[in-house]
Amino acid sequence: MSSAIPLNVGIARSAGTATVDADTAKRVLLAEPRGYCAGVDRAVETVEKALEKHGAPIYVRKEIVHNRHVVETLRERGVVFVDDTAEVPEGAVVVFSAHGVSPAVHEAAAARNLHTIDATCPLVTKVHQEAKRFARDDYDILLIGHEGHEEVEGTAGEAPEHVQLVDGPDAVDRVRVRDENKVIWLSQTTLSVDETMETVQRLRERFPSLQDPPSDDICYATQNRQVAVKAMAPECDLVIVVGSRNSSNSVRLVEVALNAGAKAAHLVDYAREVDPAWLEGVRTIGITSGASVPEILVRGVLDMLAEHGYADVQPVTTANETLVFALPRELRTTRR
C-alpha cells in the first residue's frame, strides 16, 4: 500500500546536493505523495477501457471522479455523464463512479436492462460491506461524512434503517441511538483525519461503548496526502492545492495546510487560476494535489511558478505508494 520513509522537508533537491537558504531564495516544496490514488487510477482506466471495448457513447452515473479536467477530457472522447440511471437509454453501457452507489441504484439499472460496469473504489466497497455487516447485527451505525456527497449516499443506502449521518463534531449532539451498547462509527473515505477523530472523540463522550470500524475507513491516500501537507505547511508562506471544488479530499488539504501552519492556502483546478497577487512577498510555496488530479495539472502550476522565479523545486516525501487495484472483471486484460 504505502510505506513511511525518512522525511525530507525539501531542503535539497536530492541526496547529496547543496542545501538552499530559504531566507535568500524562492523555492517550491512539492508534496510526495500527491495526485492519483489507486482507486481513481482504476476508475479512470475503467472508463477508458469501456470506451475501447464498447465504443462511444458510454454513460457514467455522476462524475467518474471529482476532477473537472478528467471529466471534460472524457466527455470529449464520447462519455456522457448523467445524474440518474433514468437518463441512460435502455440496454446501454453505464459505469458507476468511484464513489459507489446504493443497492437501489443497482436495482434501477437492472430494471432498465443496462449493462453496468462498477468502478467503485475497493476501499469504498469495504465501507459498504461494513455497513451491511453491522446492520445485520442490528447496530446503530454512525456514518461520519458530508451530507449530499455521493459516497455517503451510497454507503447509507446499504442500510438506511440503521445508518445515521454525522456531519462533523457539531452534529454529535443531535445523534440518537436505540441501544448505547450497540453503536459503531464508520466514515467517508476522504475526510480530514483530524476532524474525524475530533468527531469520534465527541461521539465517544456521549456513547462510551462506541465501537471502532474493523479497520481505518479513511483511505491510505487521503491520509498520506494530509501527512505530506502537514510536514511542509509550517515552512510555507503559501500552499497551492491542485484540485476541484467538489473534491472532498482536495478541499480537506486546504484546511489541513492552514491548520498546520501555512500562512495562506488556495485551491485551483488549473495554473491559470493562480492569482499573481498571492505570490507577493512569498518565498516558500507548497504544492500538492488531490487524489483525483492528473500530474499534468501540477506540472502546469510548477511551470507557471517557474516563470515567476520559483524554479527551485524541492520534494517533501513522507510515504511511497505502490498499491494497484484490479480493473472490473469484464475489462481485465493486461494493464497498461
UniProtKB/Swiss-Prot annotation:
Cofactor remark: Binds 1 [4Fe-4S] cluster per subunit.
InterPro entries xrefs: LytB/IspH (IPR003451)
Named cofactor requirement(s): [4Fe-4S] cluster
Pathway in which the depicted protein is active: Isoprenoid biosynthesis; dimethylallyl diphosphate biosynthesis; dimethylallyl diphosphate from (2E)-4-hydroxy-3-methylbutenyl diphosphate: step 1/1; Isoprenoid biosynthesis; isopentenyl diphosphate biosynthesis via DXP pathway; isopentenyl diphosphate from 1-deoxy-D-xylulose 5-phosphate: step 6/6
Catalysis: reaction(s): isopentenyl diphosphate + 2 oxidized [2Fe-2S]-[ferredoxin] + H2O = (2E)-4-hydroxy-3-methylbut-2-enyl diphosphate + 2 reduced [2Fe-2S]-[ferredoxin] + 2 H(+); dimethylallyl diphosphate + 2 oxidized [2Fe-2S]-[ferredoxin] + H2O = (2E)-4-hydroxy-3-methylbut-2-enyl diphosphate + 2 reduced [2Fe-2S]-[ferredoxin] + 2 H(+)
Keyword Iron-sulfur assigned: yes
Binding locations of [4Fe-4S] cluster: 37, 121, 219
Family: Belongs to the IspH family.
HAMAP family, A to Z: IspH
Protein name (Swiss-Prot/TrEMBL): 4-hydroxy-3-methylbut-2-enyl diphosphate reductase
